[in-house]
UniProtKB/Swiss-Prot annotation:
Gene Ontology terms for molecular function: ATP binding; glycerol kinase activity
Top-rank taxon, per record: Bacteria
Function text: Key enzyme in the regulation of glycerol uptake and metabolism. Catalyzes the phosphorylation of glycerol to yield sn-glycerol 3-phosphate.
Family membership noted in the UniProt record: Belongs to the FGGY kinase family.
Residues the record lists as binding ATP: 12-14, 266, 309, 313, 410
Pathway info: Polyol metabolism; glycerol degradation via glycerol kinase pathway; sn-glycerol 3-phosphate from glycerol: step 1/1
GO biological process, any: glycerol metabolic process
Organism of origin: Bacillus velezensis (strain DSM 23117 / BGSC 10A6 / LMG 26770 / FZB42) (Bacillus amyloliquefaciens subsp. plantarum)
Catalysis: reaction(s): glycerol + ATP = sn-glycerol 3-phosphate + ADP + H(+)
Name of this protein: Glycerol kinase
Phosphohistidine modified-residue sites: 230
InterPro entries, per database record: ATPase_NBD, Carb_kinase_FGGY, Carb_kinase_FGGY_CS, FGGY_C, FGGY_N, Glycerol_kin
Residues given in the record as sn-glycerol 3-phosphate binding sites: 12, 82-83, 134, 244
Keyword ATP-binding: yes
Length: 496
């Protein structure tokens, strides 16, 4: 009987279930969107029970449509939107409030207060993160402070906190396991990434009772088994978990120090494996745990770019320059260059290495000869310039030069962008055969835990190249183009 690994990819707008075989190939997949709630400007929330319902639905769809039986599933891996926060009642299993999403800015006031009290360095040194509404810690505090009766219940040990992985494992196991993995714990602003434990001082500052927190386990580990009433009468090992970006790093087989990947989604997330060293950044990068595996923890440096694929959507929907995103490549290739035009797509501020939330999008270098093609090309090029900003910061912090960049996400199908990215970084850019690297990473972590795959060496051998883009640009040209980008960013930041 052939067996498979089931990967649950719980994202910001949809939940997916993907069935992988021994070769790491996709056998079947299903996807279901769920509701986004915006109770106030800048706030983003999800209904945690609706997320759970969407996960059950995609699992059922995959099993029924693929024609397999549940006992052919050797294990389940979970990857999830990171930082999104659920607080629920231990006895009833009901969330006390909506899940507060990573994008939500509703804890800005709490963060401002913590920074004013001088806690920035304390959090940075212990967690590798910045005090920002992005991370879970202030979201938990907000729920305890704003939901009637929540703080009292939490202090009595009746409430549980979890990121989405914890919530799903708790639900799948029928409440038997309240756990998370190292990668997700490292995004909470409450976990000491050096001592590998919840930090009492940080919990005290945030006013979060320790009894709420999940147990932290390796990313490849049998956490629990599914309860039969949720899983076609079967008890299947839930055996792997990792935050989405760390999972993509694993799925890209970036197992050696200095290997890196860039995911081109709505925004971009670039991660570099720094091995067993947690490197503190001087250039606006986050220090994070990549995964816990084989009795050790590995770390990564992470850079966040807020606008990537959404800039192409803006050209399509806002500027109406084309009807299909694929056309952006055709238009960009009709001209030899952007003709001195630079687009700084700071629609929601700039992330790494600038961390400036007040700067807004700008266009520079327009002349009477500027065409639609130049404008589209300049917008695509801005994705690559931002990735170079991040990579330069990573190399400066780590002292490691990247040898190749592995890429995934929607925009990697754009050959023009990938070639320009390689030219600008002066390293080969590698696009894998399987683009679903986030779901694949979770499948691999689960598969190793249940013996479906032997180890990371076997997984590295399965990584297959679709296309490699090699740098063709001369140094002088690269320096000239990137110099123009830096001038454009500085000008945009001055215009407030």
């Amino acid at each position: 009987m052939e067996t498979y690994i089931l990967s649950i990819d719980q994202g910001t707008t949809s939940s997916r279930a993907i069935l992988f075989n021994k070769e790491g190939k996709i056998v079947h997949s299903a996807q279901k969107e769920f509701t986004q709630h915006f109770p106030q400007p800048g706030w983003v929330e999800h209904n945690a029970n609706e997320i759970w319902g969407s996960v059950l639905a995609v699992i059922a769809t995959v099993i029924s449509e693929s024609g397999i039986s549940a006992d052919q599933i050797a294990g389940i891996g979970i990857t999830n939107q990171r930082e999104t926060t659920v607080v629920w009642d231990k006895d009833t299993g009901k969330p006390v409030y909506n899940a507060i999403v990573w994008q939500s800015r509703q804890t800005s006031g709490i963060c401002e207060e913590l920074r004013e009290k001088g806690y920035n360095d304390t959090f940075r040194e212990k967690t590798g993160l910045l005090i920002d509404p992005y991370f879970s810690g202030t979201k938990v505090k907000w729920i305890l402070d704003n939901v009637e009766g929540a703080r009292e219940k939490a202090e009595n040990g009746n409430l549980l906190f979890g990121t989405i992985d914890s919530w799903l494992i708790w639900k799948m196991s029928g409440g038997a396991a309240h756990v998370t993995d190292y990668s997700n714990a490292s995004r909470t602003l409450m976990f000491n990434i050096h001592e590998l434990k919840w930090d009492d001082e940080l919990l005290d500052i945030l006013g979060v009772p320790k009894s709420m927190l999940p147990e932290v386990k390796p990313s490849s580990h049998v956490y629990a088994k599914t309860v039969d009433y949720h899983f076609f009468g079967k008890n299947i090992p839930i055996a792997g978990a990792a935050g989405d970006q760390q999972s993509a790093l694993f799925g890209q087989a970036c197992f050696e120090e200095g290997m890196g990947k860039n995911t081109y989604g709505t925004g971009c997330f670039m991660l570099m494996n720094t091995g067993e060293k947690a490197i503190t950044s001087d250039h606006g990068l986050l220090t994070t745990i990549a995964w816990g595996l084989d009795g050790k923890v590995e770390y990564a440096l992470e850079g966040s770019i807020f606008v990537a694929g959404s800039a192409i959507q803006w050209l399509r929907d806002g500027m109406r320059m084309f009807q299909d995103s694929k056309e952006s490549e055709t238009y960009a290739e009709r001209v030899d260059s952007a003709d001195g035009v630079y687009v700084v797509p700071a629609f929601v501020g700039l992330g790494t290495p600038y961390w400036d939330s007040d700067v807004r999008g700008s266009v520079f270098g327009l002349t009477r000869g500027t065409t639609k093609e130049h404008f589209i090309r300049a917008t695509l090029e801005s994705l690559a310039y931002q990735a170079k900003d991040v990579l330069d910061a990573m190399e400066a912090d780590s002292g490691i030069s990247l040898k190749t960049l592995r890429v995934d996400g929607g925009a990697v199908k754009n050959n023009f962008l990938m070639q320009f990215q390689s030219d600008l970084l002066d390293v080969p850019v590698e696009r894998p055969e399987i683009n679903e690297t986030t779901a694949l990473g979770a499948a691999y972590l689960a598969g190793i835990a249940v013996g479906y795959w032997k180890d990371s060496t076997e997984i590295a051998d399965q990584w297959n190249l679709d296309k490699q883009f090699k740098p063709e640009m001369e140094d002088e040209k690269r320096d000239e183009l990137y110099g123009g980008w830096k001038k454009a960013v500085n000008a945009a930041m001055a215009f407030k």
